[in-house]
Design a protein with these regions (language model features):
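Formylglycine-dependent sulfatase
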Residues: 1-169
């Protein structure tokens, strides 16, 4: 942990009293979208029938991005969403998002040669160094912030990296 403290904590924010509500990806992400604990949102796994994108999909109109967009926010998502997103309907954009740059399965966990749904258009990124997934997400987020900065409209930007899931390159 010394490198983490030196490189991140000393230059940013630390959370000393935080916890994950569930030790799996989808059940841990669902509370952020729904505002509910696991026993209420019923997402208990990463794949059907207990979890994943299709399990949460029927509730998308009643999630944080939908609430914020209704309240006047410009809502943008960049990166990973939920396991299974994009497998059956790769150009679908969940309710509530004004802009969407979502990683689509089965390439979500690829750091190169992956595909994003960019506002309903599928874009494939290749193997060049400039296509490293974490860097692409970061550049998109910075560009979105810069583009939106002059606006008086509040911005909600969700940037969800894949690398922490698998200690990627």
């Amino acid at each position: 942990m010394p490198n983490v403290n030196t490189l991140l904590a000393a230059r940013g924010t630390t959370f000393t009293n935080n916890f994950a509500s569930y030790p799996l990806c989808c059940p841990s992400r669902a509370p952020f979208s729904t505002g509910q604990y696991g026993h209420n949102h019923t997402i208990m796994g990463n794949a059907p029938p207990t979890g994943g994108y299709d399990k949460l999909a029927p509730t998308h109109s009643n999630t944080l991005p939908a609430w914020l967009r209704t309240a006047g926010y410009h809502t943008v998502h960049v990166g990973k969403y939920l396991n299974g997103y994009g497998r059956a309907r790769p150009t679908e954009i969940p309710a509530g998002w004004a802009e969407w740059y979502g990683a689509t399965d089965p390439s979500t966990y690829n750091f190169y040669n992956y595909r994003l749904n960019e506002n309903g258009r599928l874009v494939t990124y290749g193997t060049g160094a400039a296509n490293y997934q974490t860097d692409v997400y970061g550049r998109k987020a910075v560009e979105l912030i810069r583009r939106h900065a002059p606006s008086a409209q509040p911005l909600f930007l969700s940037v969800e990296f894949v690398a922490p899931h698998s200690a990627g390159p």
